Amino acid sequence: VPAIVDVTTGAVVNNDYHALTTELALGFKDFISPDAPDIYPEELRADIDALNVIIYADFNLAVNLAALVTNQKDYEYYYDRIFARLDWLEERLSKQRYLMGDTITDPDIRIFPTLARFDLVFYQKYLVNKKRLVDYPNLWNYAKDLYSNPAFGGTTDFDSMRKRFYYVDHTPFEDLPRLIPKGPDDSVWLEPNDRAEKFSK
């Protein structure tokens, strides 16, 4: 769970992940690089908030709920919900570089961790396996575009994800061996993407 921690006392100052990014964007402007994008511009806040609710419910949370359900009907409900949302995102990203237009905003930050884990963890282990992220051309190139930004790629550790989800994860998969998969190949994230050229003005 992301959190802001007071490094002198060790106390958690804030762990409300629903509000954390927007609070950082609004309350820490003096500490943000002047060339960093405004991830929560005032004129887009209502639309950003609405999209964040959709992404959370239909993707970020839904992939975890699909793994935690105990019956086929509920599993299929979340499965269908996830892939309907991925289809919707694929269409949205066919028209613009980022989720809210031509610059990175809060929804891009919120969706990235789930995208980074999708083929590696959710597709395989959580049985959310209709399509892989790489099977969505716009969504895949968008994810690689984000990853090529050091703020995303520089903080993404695929090996740690493997270990966390396959070896130390405590979700109800006791019947599965605790093996850390060798794949998929992480180097595909370094392949060029077409987003900048596709949406250059």
Language model features: what each stretch is:
Residues 1-201:
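C-terminal alpha-helical interaction module
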